[in-house]
């Protein structure tokens, strides 16, 4: 008789993954393994996207196997536009399925929203560690949703910024963010005000047209571009994309899914995993962009860590 899979709620996932910083070492390894090709032991196709045009949404399916963890997962993620600030349904919803890789048995069904938020922020922190200017004092976050909170949490754990700024299209949400998080955050009235002189910029918006322009960005700054996950969506303008040194999580995915890359015609310099491995340089003296689309193996790493923690405490 097959055993019933574990069902882990968002609260339980949070309990077993209290700090995003726990993900940094295994994610660095996973990114390096992914960029090593088949010998790296990561089997991961580009996500499959099923448009739900009638309702302005889509379903994404993200499977991966990682030999290092001997872990097999699939994430199901939905995105629906224009939920609005009064909606009780978030724009993104996700569920992660963890399987026993030796026989395919379903081990666990996990809330994927916490996993997505924390692993994405951890990967941005890894990119920033390698690509930020040597003396980085000002952090700017564009957007005030779930990813803004997860990025703020790990960035204030991992780095020492003297000033943190935030901008959001709806200023009330930026003010709520500043009132909610620990530490002082300056709320800015415009993107230009927020990014002026910033050393590290994080874009976590629902923008479909550019909101960040190269002429506003300090030379030598590092940008983590996290939003705009579809081929016709953008957060960054042509000037910034073409003048910066461009790093991505997956070159294959970026050339299929990233509007920031496709519509600007920018040339990809390296995958982040190649920088971690030391086969491509980190040009921290230049303006850099890390285009993060998110990869299934990142969910695999997080899900295995959570499941192992849950299993040990049963």
Curated annotation (Swiss-Prot):
Protein's organism: Homo sapiens (Human)
Reaction catalysed by this enzyme: L-pipecolate + NADP(+) = Delta(1)-piperideine-2-carboxylate + NADPH + H(+); L-pipecolate + NAD(+) = Delta(1)-piperideine-2-carboxylate + NADH + H(+); L-proline + NADP(+) = 1-pyrroline-2-carboxylate + NADPH + H(+); L-proline + NAD(+) = 1-pyrroline-2-carboxylate + NADH + H(+)
Keyword Cell division set for record: no
Disulphide bridges, residue numbers: none
Tissue: Expressed in neural tissues, muscle and kidney. Expressed in the inner ear.
Protein name: Ketimine reductase mu-crystallin
Function: Catalyzes the NAD(P)H-dependent reduction of imine double bonds of a number of cyclic ketimine substrates, including sulfur-containing cyclic ketimines. Under physiological conditions, it efficiently catalyzes delta(1)-piperideine-2-carboxylate (P2C) and delta(1)-pyrroline-2-carboxylate (Pyr2C) reduction, suggesting a central role in lysine and glutamate metabolism. Additional substrates are delta(2)-thiazoline-2-carboxylate (T2C), 3,4-dehydrothiomorpholine-3-carboxylate (AECK), and (R)-lanthionine ketimine (LK) that is reduced at very low rate compared to other substrates.
Presence of the UniProt keyword Oxidoreductase in the record: yes
Residues holding 3,3',5-triiodo-L-thyronine: 47, 257
Activity regulation comment: Inhibited by thyroid hormones triiodothyronine (T3) and thyroxine (T4).
pH effect summary: Optimum pH is 4.5 for the reduction of 3,4-dehydro-thiomorpholine-3-carboxylate at 37 degrees Celsius with NADH as cosubstrate.
Disease: Deafness, autosomal dominant, 40: A form of non-syndromic sensorineural hearing loss. Sensorineural deafness results from damage to the neural receptors of the inner ear, the nerve pathways to the brain, or the area of the brain that receives sound information.
EC number(s) per entry: 1.5.1.25, 1.5.1.1
